[in-house]
C-alpha cells in the first residue's frame, strides 16, 4: 500500500504541477472567503481546533458515507478496517459516519486498537427518532465507545428545522450533559436550512457542502441530482458568519460528491477550501490508500502555496 501511495504521489507531482500553477489565479472567488493566515508549515494531518468547542481533529477527515457508505462496503469489512487503520497511520484522526450509512455497524471494529482519546468521531441522526437518547446511546454501543465527539442532526433542508426538530435538539442537549456527546450540530442541504443553522444559538458544529464549482452545494431549494451548479457565494457568507460566532465549520462535498473525476477539479476545490480560514477541516470519502495519499498531497501542496 505504501508503494501504491508513492506511485500516486509521483504521478500527481508530474501531472499537476503545471495545472496547479495555472489554477493559482482561478481557484479563489474574490471577496467571498477570508485568506488563511500564514502560521508556518501546515499539513493535512495537523490537529486543528474545531471552532471554540475546545475539540481538536485532523484537518482532513475520512468520510465513511460515499453513496451512503456503499462505496466503502464494496471493499469488504476487512478492507474497510485496514483502510481506517491506514488513514490513521497517515495522521488522519477524524472519522465521519451516520446511522444511515452502510458502514455504521462497521465503525466499532474498524477503530479497534486505535487510541480512542486521539480520535474525533462524528456521527449523524436522521429524522425524528421516538427516543432520541436511546438512539444516541446506540451509537455509543455500536462504536464501542463512551462518547461521540460530535453528533449532528442530519440532512436538514427546511428553514424551519430549528422549530420542527426542537424535541430532537433538546435531547442532544441532555446527551451532552450526560457526556455522551462532546459537541452538537447539523448538516444542511439547502440555503434556508443553512441560514437557520447560522442563526440558531444551539448549533456548535456545521457540516457544510462547499466547493468552488458549486456542485452538490446548497441552493434555495434542496437538490439531490447535482445537475444544478449553485453560486457558492451565499454559502461562503454563512460560513463566515457562523465562524465569527465561534462555531466549528467542516467542509463536505469537496470532490463534488465524488463526481470530480478530472484531477484539475479536485485540485481547484482543495485549494479553495484550504485558502478559506473560516473552514476548520474537510471530510472526503475514500475507498483506497491511493486516494488517501492523493488527498493528503493535494492538501499539503495547497497549504504550502496558500
Question: Which functions belong to the PLM regions below?
Answer:
Residues 1-22:
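N-terminal secretory signal peptides and thylakoid transit peptides that target proteins
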Residues 27-63, 73:
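C-terminal segment of N-terminal export signals and the immediately downstream linker at the start
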Residues 50, 62, 95, 121, ...:
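Conserved, mostly hydrophobic/aromatic
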Residues 52-54, 108-116, 139-146, 198-201, ...:
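Acidic (Asp/Glu)-rich catalytic clusters
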Residues 65-77, 122-130, 260-262:
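Active-site mouth loops of central-metabolism enzymes
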Residues 74-87, 130-142, 190-195, 265-272:
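Short, acidic/polar
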Residues 143-159:
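Active-site groove signature of glycoside hydrolases
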Residues 155-306:
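Beta/alpha (TIM)-barrel catalytic core signal, keyed to glycine-rich beta->alpha loops juxtaposed to Asp/Glu
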Amino acid at each position: 500500500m505504501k508503494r501504491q501511495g508513492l506511485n500516486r504521489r509521483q504521478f500527481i507531482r508530474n501531472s499537476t504541477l503545471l495545472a496547479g500553477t495555472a489554477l493559482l489565479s482561478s481557484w479563489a472567488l474574490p471577496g467571498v472567503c477570508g485568506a488563511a493566515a500564514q502560521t508556518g508549515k501546515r499539513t493535512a494531518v495537523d490537529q486543528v481546533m474545531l471552532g471554540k468547542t475546545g475539540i481538536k481533529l485532523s484537518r482532513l477527515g475520512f468520510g465513511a458515507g460515499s453513496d451512503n457508505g456503499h462505496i466503502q462496503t464494496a471493499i469488504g469489512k476487512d478492507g474497510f478496517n485496514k483502510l481506517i487503520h491506514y488513514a490513521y497511520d497517515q495522521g488522519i484522526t477524524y472519522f465521519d459516519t451516520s446511522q444511515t450509512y452502510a458502514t455504521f455497524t462497521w465503525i466499532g471494529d474498524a477503530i479497534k486498537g486505535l487510541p480512542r482519546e486521539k480520535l474525533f468521531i462524528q456521527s449523524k441522526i436522521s429524522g425524528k427518532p421516538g427516543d432520541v437518547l436511546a438512539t444516541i446511546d446506540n451509537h455509543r454501543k455500536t462504536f464501542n465507545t463512551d462518547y461521540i465527539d460530535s453528533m449532528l442532526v442530519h440532512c436538514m433542508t427546511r428553514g424551519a428545522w430549528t422549530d420542527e426538530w426542537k424535541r430532537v435538539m433538546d435531547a442532544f442537549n441532555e446527551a451532552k450533559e450526560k457526556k455522551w456527546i462532546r459537541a452538537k450540530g447539523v448538516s444542511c442541504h439547502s440555503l434556508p436550512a443553512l441560514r437557520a443553522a447560522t442563526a440558531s444559538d444551539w448549533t456548535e458544529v456545521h457540516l457544510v457542502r462547499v466547493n468552488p464549482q458549486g456542485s452538490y452545494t446548497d441552493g434555495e431549494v434542496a437538490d439531490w441530482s447535482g445537475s444544478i451548479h449553485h453560486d457558492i457565494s451565499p454559502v461562503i457568507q454563512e460560513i463566515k458568519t457562523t465562524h465569527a460566532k465561534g462555531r466549528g465549520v467542516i467542509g463536505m462535498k469537496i470532490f463534488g460528491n465524488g463526481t470530480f473525476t478530472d484531477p484539475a477539479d479536485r485540485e481547484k476545490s482543495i485549494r479553495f477550501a484550504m485558502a478559506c480560514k473560516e473552514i476548520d477541516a474537510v471530510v472526503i470519502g475514500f475507498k483506497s490508500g491511493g486516494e488517501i495519499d492523493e488527498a493528503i498531497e493535494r492538501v499539503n501542496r495547497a497549504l504550502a502555496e496558500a
